Amino acid sequence: MATHHRQNAAGRRKVQVSYVIRDEVEKYNRNGVNALQLDPALNRLFTAGRDSIIRIWSVNQHKDPYIASMEHHTDWVNDIVLCCNGKTLISASSDTTVKVWNAHKGFCMSTLRTHKDYVKALAYAKDKELVASAGLDRQIFLWDVNTLTALTASNNTVTTSSLSGNKDSIYSLAMNQMGTVIVSGSTEKVLRVWDPRTCAKLMKLKGHTDNVKSLLLNRDGTQCLSGSSDGTIRLWSLGQQRCIATYRVHDEGVWALQANEAFTHVYSGGRDRKIYCTDLRSPDIHVLICEENAPVLKMELDRSADPHSAIWVSTTKSTVNKWSLKAVLGLRASGDYENDCSAPLMPLCTQTEQVIKGGASIIQCNILNDKRHILTKDTNNSVAYWDVLKACKVEDLGKTEFDEEIKRRFKMVYVPNWFSVDLKTGMLTITLDESDCFAAWVSAKDAGFTSSDGSDPKLNLGGLLLQALLEYWPRTHINPSDDESEANHTIGENSQLFLTSSSLKCADLATKKHIDAVNGEHESRMQKGNGYFQVPPHTPVIFGEAGGRTLFRLLCRDSGGETESMLLNETVPQWVIDITVDKNMPKFNKIPFYLQPHSSSGAKTLKKDRLSASDMLQVRKVMEHVYEKIINLDSESQTGASSAEKPSEQKEEEDMAVLAEEKIELLCQDQVLDPNMDLRTVKHFIWKSGGDLTLHYRQKST
């Protein structure tokens, strides 16, 4: 369909992989609501969320109004318009796309990818079934809705007209019902006006001193209302090409406007959280309808009755409220306005008529130093504990002290960063990037996984997660050839402690048993998934360019579908293919270090040889090396010990490990090291300096 215009992966910018940790059904708005649309025929309200989800609500069901969610966007949904008598919904998002939805059945029919930045605003000409979209790329595109809804897999081309001339990011857009005039508002602080039929520029209107955030046109396109961050509402005559009235009713920026059909009264809301009704014919006559508990983002008049008896209001919080306008209508009828400017206006309404309850939004997070778990705090001050690897919530901790919980869960262990976290949607979005996705290796035991043979293989967290995310993709079930497996598997080499000088021969610190265990683990990777865990099948997986443009979104469980599988073939970058399809596990990270006798030992300082080992190498292995290759060799040369009778290799190794811990101490910065620590933890928590890590050894005093 027109939805999927993708280039081959090789010709694209760097591709990242993201996924969202969430419930399968997210029933409540999890963040602010940017836009509203009411379908009076079906008594349905559509809300466009900052959590990327469009939800449908029954306005007749006060107790449980939720009907369904429309999910396809990957970032804030900034605007929506209902077209074709409520059958079609168009949405605009910060993921740079415009989407066309079947509003009755709730599925995405097609995706328009003409914008190159956030799409912030839509406008709709009801009489012509024409929609305009605009955003931060300064472009305005015109779309014929009937053409959009007719798109199919074979008929997938769509033509669009564009309106040029905007010099700054566009935040608001309006078009009259007849489709004869379109107006845009931007950070340029001016209104630009076009004729959408010819795409001709008509005029530029100056007057605002800040961003123009909301626009309305009357039916015949002769008058325009604008709301600005400068705190004013202006009424413009397009025939006279000038501002004919300015209304200063708000203390702060005006972000949302609604007007009655006759264009005699305007309802306004914004940063000051107050909603006013102003008589456009008498600038001094205005009433305070109500006061919200957060800045107002959007309003939608209930037009099912004339005059309008209610207004729906959304804010930066997740709850949507319906306020009665009956008291306003009563005032209008009686003409009994209070206009004592010296006294603050009292709101006509203090109780909402209906509430669509919202959910909590995550506003704070801390990645614990095991680089697997995250603590979060939400707008209800509730703390939760999450597992990034398994993409799930582990525990709700309730209203506990966030910082204390972080301290309580601290472990003296260092694992490199291998993912990033984003809270923009109010949910945890985890992003994996080629540059550091494979930086974190841990032992299976430390990760809480057990092997059938009792071994403790080293696991790459990023690699395991990618395999879990694409577990249902048939291409990942294909085994690589044995040759490929052998050529790319270098665990044995990477487990060694290497010297840069030949003056000291160093033993291989990976035993044959360990190598066999790791190779066995490699074989298990050739099965479906990773052999250790699965992520929830409903997890959304997103492939996107590093700059933010989404290339493809799907649910984890859907990657086995024919269409999805084909699109994955086009979209999945090579660095992900290497791990998930070819099963080429990345190499261990190495860490260089120096090993010297401690000053208190009285031993002669060695030639300063630079050693290199896996950063996961435990201190006890270095102690064994010191005991066997330095201390033991010295004592053997002094006593002339015979090596005629040798115990078994395994017994000798075990004895050596015990003797090393009994007789040797390893120090860093004069601090005695725990044999269970690995080198990366020593470097991060104890060395804490630039340059190569330096370790000192000494014999324990008897």
Task: Say what each PLM segment does.
Residues 510, 518-702:
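Extended, C-terminal alpha-helical/coiled-coil scaffolding tails that mediate protein-protein interactions
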Residues 1-37, 41-60, 324-353, 503, ...:
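Intrinsically disordered, low-complexity acidic/Ser/Thr/Pro-rich linker and tail segments
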Residues 54-59, 98-101, 122, 140-145, ...:
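WD40-repeat beta-propellers
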Residues 21-28, 66-72, 108-114, 134, ...:
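Short C-terminal beta-strands that terminate individual repeats in beta-propeller domains
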